[in-house]
């Protein structure tokens, strides 16, 4: 009878260990899912602030085989969206213009000292 009791206790401890590992794994997966969802929400929020349609943003980020060629279309053109877009778009915020003017002001000299510009 004592032998059966020790087996029962051993099986109980082994089962508790497996259950504990399963719970830890489940908790880890929940945290990973939560982090992924937070990242997706943040990305969707950023694109939404730029004026993109939230449904299109969701389809692009999550993606599925039915909508592989979804294109983002700008929903509105108010001042806050335009200003936010200018921050992210180098073509419209003057950086390219500044680089071009810098390049135009820089003279390139060859080894004999003659300007090639």
Curated annotation (Swiss-Prot):
Keyword Protein biosynthesis in record: no
Keywords, sorted A to Z: Capsid decoration protein, Capsid protein, Host cytoplasm, Virion
Main location (coarse class): virion
Location of the protein in the cell: Virion; Host cytoplasm
GO cellular component: host cell cytoplasm; viral capsid, decoration
One Pfam family this sequence matches: VP2_lagovir
Domain of life, per lineage: Viruses
Cited InterPro entries: VP2_lagovirus
Role summary: Minor structural protein that forms a portal-like structure at a unique three-fold axis of symmetry, following binding to the host receptor. The channel formed by VP2 may allow the delivery of the viral genome through the host endosomal membrane.
Domain notes: The N-terminus domain points away from the virion surface.
Family membership: Belongs to the lagovirus VP2 protein family.
Misc note: Translated by a ribosomal termination-reinitiation process from the bicistronic mRNA coding for VP1 and VP2.
Subunit structure: Homooligomer. The portal-like structure consists in 12 copies of VP2. Interacts with capsid protein VP1.
Protein name: Minor capsid protein VP2
Naturally occurring in which organism (per UniProt): Rabbit hemorrhagic disease virus (strain V-351)
């Amino acid at each position: 009878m004592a032998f059966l009791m020790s087996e029962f206790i051993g099986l109980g401890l082994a089962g508790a260990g497996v259950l504990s590992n399963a719970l830890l794994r489940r908790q880890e997966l929940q945290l990973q899912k939560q982090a992924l969802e937070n990242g997706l929400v943040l990305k969707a929020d950023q694109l939404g602030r730029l004026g993109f349609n939230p449904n299109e943003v969701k389809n692009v980020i999550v993606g599925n085989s039915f909508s592989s060629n979804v294109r983002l279309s700008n929903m509105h053109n108010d001042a806050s969206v335009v200003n936010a877009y200018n921050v992210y778009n180098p073509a419209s915020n003057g950086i390219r213009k500044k680089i071009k003017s810098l390049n135009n002001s820089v003279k390139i000299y060859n080894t004999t000292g003659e300007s090639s510009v």
